[in-house]
Design a protein with these regions (language model features):
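Pyridoxal 5′-phosphate
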Residues: 1-93
Length: 93
């Protein structure tokens, strides 16, 4: 029987090409990008390369691309950014 998944608000299936592209980072290049050791630095380089590719795809600067750990963190990041941008001290009349 074919299964149909309807809870896409919680998670979505990962496209096979994405899984294939990510496999090296699950097994070989898994270092903490904040660490100074070689595995960490390799991970940092990979993240910055990915950031550059995403920026290019969406017509942004690399420093404008922020990766978060998930939906809740992303939502909070956006809401805090909106609140900060609309602080009365930031208003120019």
């Amino acid at each position: 029987m074919r299964r149909i998944y309807l809870d896409h608000a919680a998670t979505t299936p990962t496209h096979p090409e994405v899984v294939e592209a990510m496999l090296p980072y699950f097994s070989d290049a898994f270092g903490n990008p904040s660490s100074l050791h070689s595995l960490g630095q390799e991970a940092k380089v990979a993240i910055e390369e990915a950031r550059g590719k995403v920026a290019h795809l969406i017509g942004a600067r690399s420093e404008e691309v922020v990766f978060t750990s998930g939906g809740t963190e992303a939502d909070n990041f956006v809401l805090k950014g909106i609140a900060y941008a609309n602080e009365p001290s930031k208003q120019q009349y």
